[in-house]
Amino acid sequence: MALSAAIVLAAGEGTRMRSNKPKVLHAFAGKTFLNRVMDSVAALNPDTLAVVVHFQAERVAEAARSYDEQVTIVNQDDIPGTGRAVQCAMAQLTEAGKVDGPVLIAASDMPLLDSETLHRLVEFHTASGNGATVLTTILDDPTGYGRIIRDSEGNVLRIVEQKDANSSELAVREVNT
């Protein structure tokens, strides 16, 4: 399995943490969220490792570079959102000729996401021939998570954030991780 790139999304402010420090720079069991996720994606040996930054961009970029001097830093513009972060990264990497195969996208606020799970995700994606593959789970209490909305054949139609979900979507227990 050859990954052309792994993109770590680290642009968010993390306002619910009520901290002056970017959420991704908070420590969890001795390492920052960012370093934990970079460990997991780097274990897959992507050709390019990129980190998307925006809030306190220089501080986050410095932390990413201290992890890996070769990391590609992508500056997200002022248009908010996860989708926009991915657009910015894909545009920069494509323009630089760094996208010629599968691309893994990982959120930097998932410090428990391990490399084995990501490895299985990429293997599944490659074997399935999917255009995109989303890692999901089913929770007894999905409060606070984006819901996975599927069609009658089981294909993912969209991910609806809790604040935007209607009552039937709120009843869905499958969430994006």
Question: What is each model feature region?
Answer:
Residues 1-19, 49:
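N-terminal nucleotide-binding beta1-loop-alpha1 segment
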Residues 2-5, 31-123, 150:
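Conserved N-terminal catalytic core of the sugar/cofactor nucleotidyltransferase
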Residues 10, 53, 107, 136-137:
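Short beta-strand/turn micro-motifs composed of small residues
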Residues 15, 23, 58:
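Glycine-centered loop/turn positions within well-structured domains
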